[in-house]
């Protein structure tokens, strides 16, 4: 144990050996005993919030304990407006700005927190999120050999293929090859000037 620090036993007033001045109201000693613990913070009966309920009555809490009146009827089943909480829909976004049929669009949704830097406001993404182009299926062959008529066999169409007139061959196209610069030292410098 630290010999310099030797705490006094509880309940013993602090001996002010050095005569240090304390501000007004500072206790010069410990209280004799702590006040007894009371489980009820507010003593007495509270008529608004009963601690129990009468046996035999249906157990329910009134919507407004003070008056007992029922809150006014709302025709909307959802107390929150739809625009406050954007929900991702399973259907494409029905937006007048999106080209229907050409693009698949995602519904408008609030940006996730990692997108919004150093702000506390949920900022929607403005446009109906990413616009995906409609997928174009790759062309697939119909399984018919080139030159054959569908529904025939090779034996039936081979005679027509062999005797069919072949077009006259096309003359080779003249190709001009540009003249390239002769290899050697370039006329410009790769190193920028050092000022």
UniProtKB/Swiss-Prot annotation:
Inhibitor of neuronal axonal outgrowth. Acts as a negative regulator of CDC42 and STAT3 and a positive regulator of STMN2. Positive regulator of CDC27. The modification Phosphoserine is found at residue 6. It is found in: Cytoplasm, Perinuclear region; Cell membrane; Cell projection, Axon. Glycans are attached at residue 46. N-glycosylated. It is a multi-pass membrane protein. The chain crosses the membrane at residues 19-42, 143-164. May form homodimers. May interact with DAZAP2, FAM168A, PRDX6, RBM6, TMTC1 and YPEL2. Interacts with CDC27. Keywords: Acetylation, Cell membrane, Cell projection, Cytoplasm, Glycoprotein, Membrane, Phosphoprotein, Transmembrane, Transmembrane helix. Belongs to the FAM168 family. GO terms for cellular component: axon; extracellular exosome; perinuclear region of cytoplasm; plasma membrane. This is Myelin-associated neurite-outgrowth inhibitor. Pfam families: TCRP1. It comes from the Eukaryota. The modification N-acetylmethionine is found at residue 1. Residues 43-142 are extracellular. Expressed in the brain, within neuronal axonal fibers and associated with myelin sheets (at protein level). Expression tends to be lower in the brain of Alzheimer disease patients compared to healthy individuals (at protein level). Residues 1-18, 165-195 are cytoplasmic.
